[in-house]
From Swiss-Prot:
Gene3D superfamilies: Lactate dehydrogenase/glycoside hydrolase, family 4, C-terminal, NAD(P)-binding Rossmann-like Domain. The lineage of its organism: Eukaryota, Metazoa, Chordata, Craniata, Vertebrata. InterPro entries: L-lactate/malate_DH, L-lactate_DH, L-lactate_DH_AS, Lactate/malate_DH_C, Lactate/malate_DH_N, Lactate_DH/Glyco_Ohase_4_C, NAD(P)-bd_dom_sf. GO terms for biological process: lactate metabolic process. The active site is at residue 193. This is L-lactate dehydrogenase A chain. Interconverts simultaneously and stereospecifically pyruvate and lactate with concomitant interconversion of NADH and NAD(+). GO terms for molecular function: L-lactate dehydrogenase activity. Its EC number is 1.1.1.27. Belongs to the LDH/MDH superfamily. LDH family. Substrate binds at residues 106, 138, 169, 248. GO terms for cellular component: cytoplasm. PROSITE patterns: L_LDH.
Length: 332
């Protein structure tokens, strides 16, 4: 008899059923691994699968995480180049793609990443036809559209990480300005994740007190306190981090884990994430932009209708036009 047989008496032969709360991360670069560790630390999955094309790096990352199993509560961590390892995932997070170079705009990355998605998405769909897709790769709004088109999934199951991080950065900077923790600072950034994002100044508040009502110049050119700079810093922050360390990873990883938690635990929290906005705010094309969405186990169930100023709506429409201009040129 083996040591195992001497030690353990079997009571019930388990059926080999698949995981119930499986999460896949596609792409094990800095962002993918930051997402993976953040998800593991939150105990959101009973199985985590990693996929990439670089096999040595992939296996190394898997082993490194497995060796930390004692300190985690995710019993199974797997990886492979073949998408069969992703089978039966509830949530698939796409971080793979060409990386943004210093000074390169997110929109410049597009066609490089479309070609990568043409390989990834059909493989994901084949093995997890009922999953929710969470796109993180940039430019995220366009690539969420691309993932939606290629996958054939209903729009509520294809989500872009969008402005969840932009809004978090905004609240962090707002907290710094006011000397209050960012959790108590409320403000929403919507629209494109990137250079043309829209800060909704009318909704910025602490404890329900509107800053715009207190100080009508907030966010305008007449503002002596330069709150507009806070939004500019949000837009510039990724470029600054990329310039200093070569890429961004931790904040986006934490932001994605925040979204994963809402989905896997069916929390129905409201997040500014990228969804199909056709028919909203006078937008007529198939574009994905961030608006406040109710998120849960089945993806996006509802959208909160924000009261926007005419110039804010105009900015959203302008973003939509820019994105559509690029999307209609894409080769699928």
């Amino acid at each position: 008899m083996s040591v195992k047989e001497l030690l353990i008496q079997n009571v019930h032969k388990e059926e080999h059923s698949h995981a119930h709360n499986k999460i896949t991360v596609v792409g094990v670069g800095a962002v993918g691994m930051a997402c993976a560790i953040s998800i593991l630390m939150k105990d959101l999955a009973d199985e985590l699968a990693l996929v990439d094309v670089i096999e040595d790096k992939l296996r190394g990352e898997m082993l490194d995480l497995q060796h930390g199993s004692l300190f985690l509560r995710t019993p199974k961590i797997v990886s492979g180049k073949d998408y069969s390892v992703t089978a039966h995932s509830k949530l698939v997070i796409i971080t793979a793609g060409a990386r943004q170079q210093e000074g390169e705009s997110r929109l410049n990355l597009v066609q490089r990443n479309v070609n990568i998605f043409k390989f990834i998405i059909p493989n994901v769909v084949k093995h997890s036809p009922d999953c929710t897709l969470l796109v993180v790769s940039n430019p995220v709004d366009i690539l969420t559209y691309v993932a939606w088109k290629i996958s054939g999934f209903p729009k509520h199951r294809v989500i872009g990480s969008g402005c969840n991080l932009d809004s978090a950065r905004f609240r962090y900077l707002m907290g710094g300005k006011l000397g209050i923790h960012s959790l108590s600072c409320h403000g929403w950034i919507i629209g494109e994740h990137g250079d043309s994002s829209v800060p909704v100044w009318s909704g910025v508040n602490v404890a329900g007190v509107s800053l715009k009502a207190l100080y009508p110049d907030l966010g305008t050119d007449a503002d002596k306190e330069h709150w507009k700079e806070v939004h500019k810093q949000v837009v510039d922050s990724a470029y600054e981090v990329i310039k200093l360390k070569g890429y961004t990873s931790w904040a986006i990883g934490l932001s994605v884990a925040d979204l994963a938690e809402t989905i896997m635990r069916n929390l129905r929290r409201v997040h500014p994430i990228s969804t199909m906005v056709k028919g909203m705010y006078g937008i007529h094309d198939d574009v994905f932009l961030s608006v406040p969405c109710v998120l849960g186990y089945s993806g996006i169930t509802d959208v909160v209708k924000m009261t926007l100023k005419s110039e804010e709506e105009e900015k959203l429409r302008k973003s939509a036009d820019t994105l559509w201009g690029i999307q209609k040129e894409l080769q699928f």
